[in-house]
Amino acid sequence: EYERRELAEQQFQILKRYGTPQEQNDFINRHLSNPEYRRMAIQNAIDAGDESTVERLALDGEYENQALPGLLQEWQKCRYHCYHRTGEREKLADVCEALLKGGEPDYYEEWKSLIPFDLKSVKIEQLLKEAPIKVYRKILLAENRVDLMAEACEKDPSDLLLYFSALKCSPFAERATEL
């Protein structure tokens, strides 16, 4: 595998120097299983303003790399930026949710703003059940869910450091100081 990738890299360097742009693009598209070439193909599509190709390349990358969390999130972030550029709010909400479930808490406020009001509380509760701990904590703080904060502190008293300022002004203040 390593030798094959090295050979492909050498071939690409020769094409960059002596080949036509079309030959370079064809080479890149034949080697999309290599993340470096997928990144190049995505960048070429962005430069050409071809957002449907960006989306397709990112989705294919997610499918191929679903067992590799780092690459999976990289391709999800490509879709995130693609949907920002195209203004596709539903798809943007979906990819934000996928990033949240993958442990990226920074997408919470944007995701929440994209959810229709009548579905918001149900979707938040659903996400709380599936969220990794970093995202779970972010949601509790953002939504001021002192009931769940108190519950979390009872299970793991070290969480008190994170939640104490919210709990000290709540009905759970006495329980928080006892912990």
Give the residues covered by each predicted segment:
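Eukaryote-biased, non-catalytic alpha-solenoid scaffold regions
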Residues: 1-179
